[in-house]
Amino acid sequence: MMTGTLGTLVPIILMFAVLYFLLIRPQQKQQKAVRQMQEELKKGDSVVTIGGLHGTVDSIDESKVVIKTGDNTRLTFDRRAIREVSAAE
């Protein structure tokens, strides 16, 4: 009787393990990389926001970033709104 129960649980456990390694773990790694990138922002970095705005970091505090665009307009965003960073130019 115990063998039958164990035999039905093994495939379910294997499915959860595969699901974890194919879906959940890569997403966690990506979120960690994005979080690290946002924490390492510095003045002068060229950035792209999640809305597609391109600009240069003008100033930073703990939760907000001021971005200067091509026409010297300054816009304030949450740090979480930064999608990509390229090195300071």
Swiss-Prot record:
S-S pairs: none
Pfam families (UniProt xref): YajC
UniProt KW Cell membrane keyword: yes
Membrane-spanning residues: 4-24
Entry keywords, A to Z: Cell membrane, Membrane, Protein transport, Translocation, Transmembrane, Transmembrane helix, Transport
Subunit and interaction comment: Part of the SecDF-YidC-YajC translocase complex. The SecDF-YidC-YajC translocase forms a supercomplex with SecYEG, called the holo-translocon (HTL).
Record-stated family: Belongs to the YajC family.
Protein name per the record: Sec translocon accessory complex subunit YrbF
Organism: Bacillus subtilis (strain 168)
Lineage: Bacteria, Bacillati, Bacillota, Bacilli, Bacillales
